[in-house]
Amino acid sequence: MKKLKPLFAILTAALILFSAVCFLYPAISNAINEQYNESRIDDYNNNVDSISQEDIDDYFSAAEKYNKALATDVSTDDSKLSILSHYDEILDLDDGVMGYVEIPSINVRLPIYHGESEDVLTKGAAHLEHTSFPIGGESTHVCISAHCGYPTQKFFDDIDELENGDEIYIYVLDRTLKYTVTGTDVVEPDDSSKLEVVQGKDLLTLVTCTPYGVNSHRLLVHAERAPFEAATSDSAATVSQVTRTVPKSHQLQIIIAGLAVIAVVIVKV
């Protein structure tokens, strides 16, 4: 009987530890994916730092042409169709990321990818094709979509908590764009009337599924461009640092340390 006690203790500890891992799986998975997103954003910033100002200007020029073509009323113009057909090449630094979005009030920081494929939506935020590229300017309407209720990571789960006046930051190349929330809408999935360009306006809309777990409609969070002084790489880093109550790069280490403590306590008991 005494020989069984150590085995019983080990099995009990293993069972409790396994239960703890299952309970913490969403947090662990989220921390891993957030760390991956941080590395993608770091890689993007390093890529931007490595290219010349001339190349940066060329990237913006191509995006501006796309946005102007998108804002024109003639949908069958050959030159417009030609420009729009090069969507995947615009703001493409060969790493798949065109920039990143940051929402301080709900602690969101995600890379932005081209298009709304399922592969993209499992990694970060998606820029909706046939909407303006996120470079700012009059008569532009940027639309960025992300999952809600995804099992392995939080994306736009909390954008329903955003209030008028909350700030959203978009980082593209060497530009930092600041938008403030102006309102929300709930629409049918095929209703794009709220995503159209408004002449003279510089707009941003965040898109996700709603209600949570049902996903029968789309939640739209609208925002409008606001002044942001000294939008340099240094100021962008400062904004990024203050948005996170716990740095995402440390979340996984905290969880692992917690599991280790649980295991030690159980084994000693």
Question: For each predicted feature, which ranges?
Answer:
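Solvent-exposed, non-transmembrane regions of membrane-associated and secreted proteins
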Residues: 4-250
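C-terminal single-pass membrane-anchor helix
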Residues: 239-269
